[in-house]
């Protein structure tokens, strides 16, 4: 059953829809592309909710009418009424779930692009190789979704692994799908260099940040310490004779970003600022979330980066997501970018937790 809080929100839905329809033909809105997209998106969501609520009210009315037929002296009519009532109650439950999901608070970052950061963890070179495999997994997932991947910074190892990679993933809904990937990923396998056949455990950490636009985060010049240096290669040797590498420190938070992939200092500085904005947005968003969720956590492991979220076990061809007790024996498919099944289950779990929180209000 829908609670009073949700019913109150639904009562004004048609009025809200009329206002949004009027806004779609407002000249002020039409000349502002960003505002128009925002209104069109809200109109689409509200229209869907309005249709669901209309059907819900009709089903409630049909239930009451069908109940009156249960006392009919005609046995055949009674049996038909019982069957109809069963179907109507089932549809009522389905509609309640759909309406509740539509009314869940939307994450304002869901439609944003993503800054993806992957770093090798415990396990030396094996961890660096695993970090590289994770990056390829996300690249392939992005390809499947039609998203673009742009490497902002990469520190490879001599043996083909990755110490750290930072990339921008551009595409509709990128953050809504990838935000659950933040945390510690663990691999269990026999390294190629291991002669005794012993299984090693290594880790890599993944951070997924919504891309921050300049309007999202205000950075004052006096808050920045900008240093330039010569870029160095995988083995530490200097690869550039000019001071093209850039390191930016945000003094109030102590956040440090380095970038050396481009040949020009100007390009490295622009990329470093892009990463810094995303990290600062994430930092301030986290502070806000911690304040709001002091008493109750509603997210499925999208917060703590030290949380061990997933294990990739090569000998068993197994991937386990520890947050939702999900296990798949399609390890190579998943590493090839087939992530939708896991992500869909993580989204469903988050919705379930949010619905539970709403029902307790």
From Swiss-Prot:
<dbReference type="InterPro" id="IPR045853">
    <property type="entry name" value="Pep_chain_release_fac_I_sf"/>
</dbReference>
<feature type="modified residue" description="N5-methylglutamine">
    <location>
        <position position="237"/>
    </location>
</feature>
<dbReference type="InterPro" id="IPR000352">
    <property type="entry name" value="Pep_chain_release_fac_I"/>
</dbReference>
<dbReference type="Pfam" id="PF03462">
    <property type="entry name" value="PCRF"/>
</dbReference>
<dbReference type="GO" id="GO:0016149">
    <property type="term" value="F:translation release factor activity, codon specific"/>
</dbReference>
<dbReference type="Pfam" id="PF00472">
    <property type="entry name" value="RF-1"/>
</dbReference>
<protein>
    <recommendedName>
        <fullName>Peptide chain release factor 1</fullName>
    </recommendedName>
</protein>
<dbReference type="InterPro" id="IPR005139">
    <property type="entry name" value="PCRF"/>
</dbReference>
<comment type="function">
    <text>Peptide chain release factor 1 directs the termination of translation in response to the peptide chain termination codons UAG and UAA.</text>
</comment>
<dbReference type="InterPro" id="IPR004373">
    <property type="entry name" value="RF-1"/>
</dbReference>
<dbReference type="InterPro" id="IPR050057">
    <property type="entry name" value="Prokaryotic/Mito_RF"/>
</dbReference>
<dbReference type="GO" id="GO:0005737">
    <property type="term" value="C:cytoplasm"/>
</dbReference>
<keyword id="KW-0648">Protein biosynthesis</keyword>
<keyword id="KW-0963">Cytoplasm</keyword>
<keyword id="KW-0488">Methylation</keyword>
<comment type="similarity">
    <text>Belongs to the prokaryotic/mitochondrial release factor family.</text>
</comment>
